[in-house]
């Protein structure tokens, strides 16, 4: 198994859920990638190399503070990129 940052998957899922309700902003792949990168730069990395590590990190997702932190940074990233798209 390769080393990967599981936070990328968490942020991607949160971003997709958040964008479902947004109809007044650009949702092109460039903007989505910028939003994801912006949020990831503000959140701690969650590197995993095993199934056990992935499961442990997945369990952290149910913690209210963890979810709130991810949602806060995703919301900020959406606002920031929407105001200043790079295309």
Task: Explain the meaning of each model-derived region.
Residues 1-87:
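Charged, amphipathic alpha-helical regulatory modules used
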